[in-house]
């Protein structure tokens, strides 16, 4: 859909959810909207006042959703554990000490629900980040194939892009869908971890590194697992080159 449609969808969601929706300002033309509503009854009354011949499909769906809900409008959000894959470049600086950098891709998925039961507005969010880690590690176990180590350092996560997909659900039907792209904020993190490494061939290995991280508040409006749960355990895995 065009930018106007996406702008309308974003503003409709922000109109109902309020400032806590975590949505950025939309691209494209911005429709005139009243103050944010706090109850479903108020929102339904507003939609009835707008009702006219040739009413749009999305407004009909919103009226049905508002009619079948009551009380205060509350947004429920759920954030999934991130998926993180890395390519690590590790330099040995002593018998057991290493320094590391590389690239680390992370996918953050969340869903948000406005409404209850079979009548609701659902929003699925995906945010893609490319991280640059800088860490030091100490190897405390080493054999021919396996090694174990502990690490500490920081990570700069650079946003690639984000996408929101919204759907209006009325019983067994989904009469309206839309989606739009956005750019989230840069995200810094510091953390510690303990990793397990399997040596494939000389210099090349696979690793799995459960880590405890603090994602430093970035002041952005987008809600992710990193912003809502800044102290988070992640389990990066990937390929490592050591020299």
Where are the language model's segments positioned?
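Transmembrane beta-strands of outer-membrane beta-barrel pores
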Residues: 19-25, 105-109, 140, 154-162, ...
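Residues that define the transmembrane beta-barrel architecture of outer-membrane proteins
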Residues: 11, 79-83, 126-130, 146, ...
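Extracellular/periplasm-exposed beta-strand and loop segments of Gram-negative cell-envelope proteins
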Residues: 48-78, 108-129, 159-185, 221-228
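C-terminal structural cap/anchor segments
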Residues: 132, 136-141, 146-152, 165-170
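Conserved catalytic residues of ABC-type ATPase nucleotide-binding domains
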Residues: 1-85, 90-98, 110
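Predominantly the C-terminal beta-signal and adjacent terminal strand-loop region
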Residues: 183, 187, 199-243
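Repeated loop/turn-to-beta-strand initiation elements of outer-membrane beta-barrel proteins
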Residues: 96-99, 143-146, 203-206
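Residues on the lipid-exposed face of transmembrane beta-strands in outer-membrane beta-barrel proteins
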Residues: 85-91, 101-105, 132-138, 152-156, ...
């Amino acid at each position: 859909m065009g930018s106007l449609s996406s702008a309308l969808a974003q503003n409709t969601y922000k109109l109902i959810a309020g400032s806590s929706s975590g949505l950025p300002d939309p691209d494209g033309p911005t429709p005139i909207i009243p103050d944010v509503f706090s109850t479903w009854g108020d929102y339904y009354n507003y939609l009835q006042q707008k009702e006219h011949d040739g009413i749009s499909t999305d407004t009909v769906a919103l009226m049905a959703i508002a009619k079948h809900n009551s009380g205060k409008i509350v947004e429920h959000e759920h954030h999934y554990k991130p998926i993180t894959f890395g390519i690590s470049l590790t330099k040995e600086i002593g018998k057991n000490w290493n320094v590391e950098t590389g690239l680390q891709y992370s996918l953050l998925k969340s869903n948000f629900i406005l409404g209850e039961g079979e009548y609701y507005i659902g929003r699925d969010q995906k945010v893609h980040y490319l991280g640059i880690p800088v860490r030091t590690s100490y190897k405390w176990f080493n054999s021919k194939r396996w090694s174990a180590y502990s690490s500490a350092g920081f990570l700069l996560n650079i946003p690639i892009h984000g996408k929101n997909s919204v759907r209006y659900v009325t019983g067994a039907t989904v009469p309206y869908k839309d989606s739009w792209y956005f750019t989230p904020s840069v995200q810094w993190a510091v953390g510690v971890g303990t990793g397990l490494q399997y040596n494939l061939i000389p210099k090349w290995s696979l690793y799995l590194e459960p880590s405890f991280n603090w994602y430093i508040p970035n002041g952005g409006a987008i809600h992710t697992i990193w912003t809502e749960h800044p102290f988070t355990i992640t389990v990066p895995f990937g390929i490592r080159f050591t020299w």
